[in-house]
Amino acid sequence: MKFMITYEIPQDKYLPTMSAFGAMSVEDDKKDMGPDIKLLGRYHDLAGKRGWCIVEAATLEIVSAWGLNWAGACQITCTPVLDDKSARAVLSSHPLCKKK
């Protein structure tokens, strides 16, 4: 499953949170994420104190466990998402989307 994760960091937690993240090595980041999450892309709006990523994992529980590592520092939203191929498969078989 693919998940879109967004985060926003409150002003009072911004500098400590970004300092902690900025000090992490690639290995630290992988350890923080765990072995069962594949990071497909992550982007940061540093001035806006927010960002997002797309990850792949077997379950929401796996992604939620990673999110708990940062839950005290930022507001996190996790949404299951589909790529174009999967979305088209759902839409093509849905009765509301069938051509008449």
Residue ranges and their predicted role:
Residues M1-K100:
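Conserved, structured core segments of small domains
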